[in-house]
């Protein structure tokens, strides 16, 4: 197992244990309800005009049941913010440096005698620079959304 894979696995485990699951913002929740209402109206139009009053009453009851059964897909606001900041100018530079380092390490690992090397390059420094930037950039916005 390479150093990058080990760091990646460690990071994923750390995120799972440390990062709390964040509920969707009220705006996202309202948008999802509006989309579901629009879908319900489309279904009613497809059913035809026969006994419209009876169909609407039945469809309303069915929609309520479906809403309860369907699990709403909640997006993690932290991940959304991280992706946003990875695409900023500073974020792109840090991601680029990390990916370059990862490529160098991957190439070194494939060369013979890698296991015997005294100093093996890892990308811990680049990784932590990237994570530090993402954490400091996302934290204020995330907490503002959670208020």
Swiss-Prot record:
Q: Which GO terms describe its biological process?
A: aerobic respiration; cellular respiration; mitochondrial electron transport, ubiquinol to cytochrome c; proton transmembrane transport
Q: Which Pfam families match?
A: UCR_hinge
Q: Where is this region: Disordered?
A: 25-89
- Give the superkingdom in one word: Eukaryota
Q: Which keywords accompany this UniProt record?
A: Disulfide bond, Electron transport, Membrane, Mitochondrion, Mitochondrion inner membrane, Respiratory chain, Transport
Disulphide linkage map: 101-123
List residues traversing the bilayer.
none
Which GO CC terms are listed, alphabetically?
Answer: mitochondrial inner membrane; mitochondrial intermembrane space; mitochondrion; nuclear periphery; respiratory chain complex III
Q: Where in the cell is it found?
A: Mitochondrion inner membrane
Signal peptide positions are none
InterPro entries reported in the protein's UniProt record = Ubol_cytC_Rdtase_hinge_dom, Ubol_cytC_Rdtase_hinge_dom_sf
Q: Where is the composition biased (Basic and acidic residues)?
A: 79-89
User: In what way does this protein cross or attach to the membrane?
Assistant: Peripheral membrane protein
Acidic residues compositional bias, start-end = 41-78
Similarity comment: family membership: Belongs to the UQCRH/QCR6 family.
State whether it acts alone or in a complex, and with which partners, per the record: Component of the ubiquinol-cytochrome c oxidoreductase (cytochrome b-c1 complex, complex III, CIII), a multisubunit enzyme composed of 10 subunits. The complex is composed of 3 respiratory subunits cytochrome b (COB), cytochrome c1 (CYT1) and Rieske protein (RIP1), 2 core protein subunits COR1 and QCR2, and 5 low-molecular weight protein subunits QCR6, QCR7, QCR8, QCR9 and QCR10.
Q: What does this protein do?
A: Component of the ubiquinol-cytochrome c oxidoreductase, a multisubunit transmembrane complex that is part of the mitochondrial electron transport chain which drives oxidative phosphorylation.
Q: What else is known?
A: Present with 4490 molecules/cell in log phase SD medium.
Query: Know the name of this protein?
Result: Cytochrome b-c1 complex subunit 6, mitochondrial
